[in-house]
């Protein structure tokens, strides 16, 4: 299973919201590049980046920061937030993004989603962000009457490469994800699915693995930033997954993870010392 640590960008900083409420914004790192470095050194292979300013304004706003992260680190990065045109998609793919996340533009215009899936085959992810099964758009500020499963039945054959389902009422709350809806999506639609919103502990991760519902992975935000899920534990879950898929030595992967975690500890120590000296 893939674990995507999340970096949400606002005013060039790494932040988290609660239930998508911009009044609840909390800064976790002034420097998103440093945050990406922490995730990279911990051994994560995937990264979820959302441009919150872009989502609000309807265009790419933090493109420079996104580009620097992609260029500096060896993540497979999925990027979303304010992507409403093919020009924006092309720019992000040129930077090296692995997946482009469409939300508002896709919900408003199904033909746009279909055309993008054809033109950028394998690169388009669809974000389904909902309150009580009704999809929300425009940085989650506008609630539609469109039901998740009704919409999926329309677009299921477009060639979407990934679905991202977020229960907005759980996002940033550390109360656990909406397993019921997540599993229903996984069971009824043959599209790789990432679960987002409310992942609270390693127990949530274990449940998804044990339940074996064809989930591609999870997106984790506040639970990692607030040490509900410790980096080293999440990384060890990745080790187990790599072992299953590559049939390589588990001991070898554990040693590699410990080496990387040592680098993370050193990095955090140096960062704290630098902060004290300022």
Language model region names:
Residues 12-23, 97-171:
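Conserved anion-binding
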């Amino acid at each position: 299973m893939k674990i995507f640590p999340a970096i949400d960008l606002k005013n060039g900083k790494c932040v988290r919201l609660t239930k998508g409420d911009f009044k609840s914004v909390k800064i976790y790192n002034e420097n998103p590049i440093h945050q990406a470095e922490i995730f990279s050194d911990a051994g994560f292979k995937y990264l979820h980046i959302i441009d919150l300013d872009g989502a609000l304004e309807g265009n790419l706003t933090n493109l420079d920061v996104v580009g620097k992260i992609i260029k500096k680190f060896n993540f497979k990065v999925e990027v979303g937030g304010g992507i409403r045109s093919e020009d924006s998609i092309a720019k992000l793919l040129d930077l090296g993004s692995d997946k482009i996340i469409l939300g508002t533009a896709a919900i408003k215009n199904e033909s746009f989603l279909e055309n993008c899936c054809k033109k950028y085959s394998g690169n388009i992810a669809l974000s389904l962000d909902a309150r009580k099964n009704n999809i929300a758009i425009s940085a989650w500020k506008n609630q539609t009457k469109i039901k998740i499963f009704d919409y999926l039945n329309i677009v299921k054959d477009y060639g979407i490469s990934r679905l991202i389902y977020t229960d907005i009422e759980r996002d940033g709350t550390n109360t656990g994800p909406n397993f019921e809806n997540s599993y229903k999506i996984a069971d009824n639609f043959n599209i790789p699915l990432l679960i987002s919103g409310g992942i609270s502990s390693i127990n949530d991760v274990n449940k998804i693995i044990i339940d074996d519902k064809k989930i591609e992975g999870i997106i984790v935000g506040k639970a990692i930033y607030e040490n509900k899920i410790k980096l080293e534990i999440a990384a060890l879950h990745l080790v187990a997954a790599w072992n299953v898929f590559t049939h390589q030595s588990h001991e070898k992967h554990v040693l590699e993870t410990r080496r990387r975690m040592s680098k993370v500890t050193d990095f955090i120590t140096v960062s704290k010392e630098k902060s004290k000296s300022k």
